[in-house]
């Protein structure tokens, strides 16, 4: 047993922290409670053996969401001395890349990582709408409009055989790129449909073979490999 009167050296403290980080569950912080909830459901379908080892933190009482709020949350975790491995996982859009720029270039503990949802082939040639055009233009929307709903399955993005278009909104000067997003109503429809998709897959595993889990699997792979490299 450790003698409480014995001083702990910095080296010993670092060693213990490293052991806790390796053995304890991986904490995944997202931009909001909806992302955490949907990714937790996704994990139960694609990687059920990892449930309990990967924890998506639900901060539903958090007053604000988004990438800027996520950056503050990571800083709070670091200041509190959370020893678990902590992964900040953000959207793959212009706003998130801009908001997390400082965090990614700063000095974080070795047990912390910052990642975005990965680029997806589906999003490399995707219909978009400009502010003054009703005719879709196909563009690469990776890193510009890659919110979670874009990763939950092609069949959920389609309506009447057409992909829900990305609407370009604000221009982010620092990245010289526009921010894009699908309509909020469509986002809510996709979230509801995904929950039904998960229920169907859990009740009938064969059903999952006819569903598109490509984007979800790519995100989970990003999580699992986040600590392979600095």
Task: List the predicted regions and their residue ranges.
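Acidic, divalent-metal-binding catalytic cores of TOPRIM
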Residues: 1-230
């Amino acid at each position: 047993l450790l003698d409480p009167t014995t001083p702990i050296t910095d080296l010993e403290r670092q060693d213990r922290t490293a052991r806790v980080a390796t053995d304890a569950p991986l904490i995944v912080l997202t931009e909001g409670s909806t992302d955490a909830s949907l990714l937790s459901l996704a994990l139960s379908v694609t990687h059920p053996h990892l449930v309990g080892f990967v924890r998506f933190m639900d901060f539903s009482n958090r007053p604000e969401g988004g990438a800027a709020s996520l950056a503050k949350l990571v800083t709070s975790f670091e200041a509190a001395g959370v020893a678990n491995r902590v992964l900040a996982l953000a959207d793959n859009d212009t706003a998130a890349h801009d908001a997390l720029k400082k965090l990614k270039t700063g000095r974080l503990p070795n047990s912390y990582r910052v990642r975005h949802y990965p680029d997806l082939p589906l999003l490399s040639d995707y219909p978009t709408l400009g502010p003054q055009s009703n005719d879709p233009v196909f563009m690469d929307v990776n890193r510009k409009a890659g919110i979670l709903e874009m990763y939950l399955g092609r069949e959920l993005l389609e309506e009447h055989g057409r992909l829900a278009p990305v609407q370009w909104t604000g221009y982010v000067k620092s990245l010289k790129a526009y921010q894009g997003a699908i309509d909020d109503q469509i986002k809510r429809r996709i979230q509801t449909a995904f929950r039904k998709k998960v229920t169907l897959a859990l009740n009938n595993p064969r059903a999952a073979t006819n569903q598109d889990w490509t984007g979800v699997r790519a995100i989970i792979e990003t999580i699992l490999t986040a600590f392979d490299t600095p």
